[in-house]
Amino acid sequence: LMGGGMGMPRFEAAVVGNLELAWLIPLALIGTVCGWLYFVSEHTSEALAHAIGDRPVVKAMLAGLALAICGTVLPYTMFAGETQADVLMETYLTIPAGVLITTGLVKAMLTPALINLGWRGGHFFPVIFSGVSLGYGLAILTGADPVFCVAVCTASTMGAVMRQPVMVVGLLLMCFPL
């Protein structure tokens, strides 16, 4: 009933102790800031798209250039995130914490920019991936349970972006066990 599906990652149960509880609020605040960065990028890229006007080739080339630059420096920003979230589950310890955190923040800002410049797709999977990457990076820095960090960061990032808490809980039940 609540298994993974539709390309969504499925995480194991988190271990919650005193360390995790101490980090709950800071992690939620960081995830919320990630969601706010999404909106900063959305408003900025809307203004840019409006300034460019009805020139779809210019918009597509600018979006492609942004994606190419980000993808060269941070390869996990290249795709929507369904598959990359599963890869991060297995490999996050081999990636520096700063790279994971930066990837999460850049992905959150890159997604609305690409959409506003005419690229197709939605924000749902990229926002989940932003929270996952951010959470794994913060787990490395804090020593807290990785699944706990991922759950808090993903929930707070999605909550900030979607602004529909019941929907966020419902969607995240497909990724995280009760």
Description of each model-found segment:
Residues 1-178:
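Alpha-helical transmembrane segments and immediately membrane-proximal extracytoplasmic
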